[in-house]
A protein has these predicted regions:
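Short beta-strand elements at the ligand-binding edges of bilobed clamshell
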Residues: 1-2, 16, 47, 115-127
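Short beta-strand->loop
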Residues: 15-24, 48-51
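Acidic, glycine-anchored loop motifs typical of Ca2+
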Residues: 6, 10-12
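Hydrophobic alpha-helical
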Residues: 33, 45-46, 50-111
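Hinge/cleft segment of the Venus flytrap/periplasmic-binding protein
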Residues: 10, 17-21, 36, 125-162
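Non-catalytic structural scaffold of enzyme domains
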Residues: 1-3, 109-110
Length: 162
C-alpha cells in the first residue's frame, strides 16, 4: 500500500469511471464494486460517466480539478476503452501513471499490461468481474503487486508477468 498510497493517508484515493449513466451493465458493475470493496481502505475522489468511450473518458477526466488529478492513486473503469482514455491523458500530460484497472479483454489493454504501464483488466464475465476487480485492489492495497502474477483475468487469456 505504501508505494501506491502517495499521500500516506492510509487509503487509496481513486476515481471511478462508469459507462452510460442508465445502462444496466454500468449500474451493475459500479454497484458490485462499491458493495464488494466497502471494507477496503478506499477514498472516492470522483465518479464520472464516460459512456464506454475512450475520448469521452479522457475529456471528463481532464475536467477534474488539478488537485483531484494529482491526488489520484487509482482509476477503476467499467471498461478497457475508458481505462485507455485515462491512460492517454496521463501519457499526454507526462504524469506518473496511477494504478489503472479496466474490464473487457481488449488486446490494447493486454499490451499495456504486458509493458507494465497499466495494472490490470478483468474478463467481461458477469459472475466474476467485480470480485476480480476487488481482488486486484486488495493486492494493490497489500503491496502484493509483484507477487500477484495474474493481472489479466480473461478467457482465453491469463496474462502473467515473468
Amino acid at each position: 500500500r505504501n508505494r501506491v498510497d502517495k499521500d500516506k493517508n492510509g487509503k487509496i484515493d481513486y476515481v471511478l469511471i462508469e459507462g452510460e449513466e442508465d445502462h444496466y451493465d454500468a449500474i451493475r458493475r459500479t454497484k458490485g464494486f462499491l458493495e464488494n470493496s466497502k471494507d477496503l481502505p478506499l477514498n472516492t475522489l470522483g465518479t464520472l460517466s464516460a459512456s464506454w468511450n475512450r475520448q469521452l473518458a479522457y475529456k471528463k477526466f481532464s475536467q477534474l480539478d488539478n488537485n483531484a488529478i494529482s491526488s489520484t492513486e487509482a482509476v477503476i473503469c467499467n471498461n478497457d476503452d475508458m481505462a485507455l482514455g485515462v491512460y492517454d491523458y496521463y501519457k499526454e500530460k507526462n504524469l506518473a501513471l496511477p494504478i489503472i484497472l479496466g474490464i473487457n479483454n481488449s488486446q490494447e489493454m493486454n499490451e499495456k499490461i504486458m509493458s507494465g504501464e497499466i495494472y490490470g483488466s478483468v474478463d467481461n464475465n458477469m459472475d466474476n468481474q467485480v470480485l476480480r476487480i476487488v481482488k486486484c485492489m486488495e493486492s494493490v492495497l497489500n503491496g502484493n503487486t509483484k507477487k500477484y502474477k495474474k493481472v489479466w483475468y480473461s478467457t482465453p487469456y491469463a496474462v502473467t508477468r515473468e
